[in-house]
């Protein structure tokens, strides 16, 4: 099973400030910000969840960087599972998989269970969080490889290659 890390994600308290800091400290960027991402459906620890989050996506060397903030007060979420609203730190790495259920079974066989499964409302992206905290200290996000996701990753990578470092944020 190909489980190459495609993204590293940090929970942050202020997305734009975090983007600026990642640029200044590590030359990461530029960033596209998706605000108030809603879910079509979601389940966390076997219970329905409808958290709202915002994410900034940028390039950090050869890997995508996500800076994520939960925007609502939901408590049953993969973000509140690890961090309070003002706390920051690594939340997950992400891998694209060929088959979601097979990936879940693979991780489960190593005592890393599926904690969260959701579908975004607008883009209809299915994703899940594997609880790898006992083994790695953070979660693993999984989603099935798709043209939509591959195109988005390529867009972010291309923007980084063409970046003149005059503008930290870009839109699509």
Tell where the protein language model's regions lie, with residue ranges.
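Glyoxalase I/VOC metalloenzyme domain signal
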Residues: 1-6, 10-32, 47-113, 131-172
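Intrinsic, low-complexity N-terminal interaction/targeting segments
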Residues: 39, 79, 114-120, 124-129
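N-terminal beta-loop-helix "entrance" segment that forms/cooperates
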Residues: 39-46
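Short linear motifs in intrinsically disordered
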Residues: 46-48, 118-119
């Amino acid at each position: 099973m190909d489980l190459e890390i495609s993204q590293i994600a940090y929970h942050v308290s202020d997305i734009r400030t975090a983007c600026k800091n990642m640029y200044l400290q590590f030359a990461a960027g530029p960033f596209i910000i998706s605000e108030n991402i809603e879910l079509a459906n979601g389940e966390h620890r076997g219970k329905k969840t409808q958290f709202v989050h915002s994410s900034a996506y940028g390039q950090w060397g050869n890997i995508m960087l996500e800076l994520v903030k939960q925007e609502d007060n939901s408590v049953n979420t993969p973000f509140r599972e690890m961090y309070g609203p003002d706390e920051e730190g690594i939340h997950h790495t992400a891998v694209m998989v060929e088959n979601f259920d097979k990936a879940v079974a693979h991780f489960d066989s190593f005592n890393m269970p599926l904690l969260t499964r959701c579908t975004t409302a607008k883009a209809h992206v299915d994703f899940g969080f594997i609880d790898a905290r006992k083994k790695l200290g953070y979660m693993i996000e999984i989603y099935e490889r798709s043209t939509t996701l591959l195109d988005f990753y390529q867009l972010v990578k291309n923007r980084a290659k063409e970046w003149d470092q005059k503008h930290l944020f870009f839109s699509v």
